[in-house]
Amino acid sequence: MVKDEITTTKYLIHSQINAKGFVEKPDVVGAIFGQTEGLLSDSLDLRELQKTGRIGRIKVDMTNRSGRTKGEIIIPSSLDRIETTILAASLETINRVGPCEANLRVTKIEDVRAVKRRTIVERAKELYQNMMEEFTPESSRMIDEVKESIRRPEIIEYGEDNLPAGPNTPTSDAILIVEGRSDVLNLLKYGIKNTIAVEGVNVPKTVADLTKKRTVTAFLDGDRGGDLILKELLQIGDIDYVTRAPRGLEVEYLDKDQVIYALKNKTSVDKITSHANYNHNQHRYHNKPKSHDKFESKLHEVTSSVNKTDKYSQKNESKQFKQQKNENKQVKDNSKEKTQKSTEKHNETEETHLNKYELMLKELSGTGKGRLYDMDFNLLKEVKVSDIYNEVKNSKETIKNIVFDGIITQRIVDLSKEKNIECLVAVKMSEVVKKPETIKIITK
């Protein structure tokens, strides 16, 4: 394709000609003009179109071999698409060139503007590449520096072992134990800042000490390394919950949904006896709980002791002692009956409170408001849900119960613990990781 054709035309008609004999270029050009003359309307007459410059110079490239002639014909066109295709189709009516039989076939119609666009894109790529190599984008470097300065303080070094940890680890009541620094970084991306890494299979003393003071969840990889760390934690630590990444995955590569799912489905250590039977997908252990084994052991000791005492009694007790024993039994039965009544009364009170909470929440439904109550459920104040946090934080009154038409968040729970609030009642609860045992949380 010649450069001036690209700049002066819209389309190029490419066609192939085969002639049974020896023919030359002038024969082909003459056949094109001669056999298409009068075939189409005057507006599409080739001679007229060439005079007005709407058709360019016809180019023919011929080869003669074994008494036959083959060649390629290129006709530049500045007509529109429809006129160009009609003109191209008319070329296929040519059946003779000079004295020889021939046939002509249009192979393609090339859009010169598309070629220009491709040329522009390729050249733009070259220019951009050169620019990137020659000039360092200052603004990009500035952005990276600012991001790095923000990111760097997020991870702290905690304890005498200088372990990687989230910024809230020193003050948080609940912490997450993970395997490495990358896990801490990944959880920081999703706003989880109460993490600490053990940095290997051997659990450091810093982490072992922390497990005795805080509510601890072990969030470990779903691989062999996670199994080993869990075994170590169960032996030397005092963890409360365990959760795992899906089998074969690591915490550092989990997305936000996977992290939230794992934390929601954590398993209490009380239900665990052997980490080897831990199922990564269901987050549960299949053997009997530890606490049950301990309970059975203690029960066996007590039973043995009682049996020994009974044998001794049977040998030595007199009628008077038997009478005393019957009196003691009666006292015991009376005590048991009182305890049972007390339990029933407590359950009734609990049920009454639940009904009261439901009624209060129903009254607030759709209002977007909340109510603050004291110990005896006397209304202290009614406020908008958006103002509850500030009202509770700044209040000098003794608030014990909060009922509101909204969502319980970690922020509200933390403030309630700080203010010694006993009960939170709301429509639903968001992703709350730390739930203090001193606060009763009720949702719709």
Curated annotation (Swiss-Prot):
Binds two Mg(2+) per subunit. It catalyses: ssDNA + n NTP = ssDNA/pppN(pN)n-1 hybrid + (n-1) diphosphate. InterPro entries: DnaG_primase, Primase_DnaG_arc, TOPRIM_DnaG/twinkle, TOPRIM_dom. Mg(2+) 2 binds at residues 221, 223. One of its GO terms (cellular component) is DNA-directed RNA polymerase complex. GO terms for biological process: DNA replication, synthesis of primer. GO terms for molecular function: DNA-directed RNA polymerase activity; metal ion binding; poly(A) binding. Gene3D superfamilies: 3.40.1360.10. Its cofactor is Mg(2+). HAMAP family: DNA_primase_DnaG_arc (MF_00007). PANTHER family: DNA PRIMASE. This is DNA primase DnaG. The gene is dnaG.
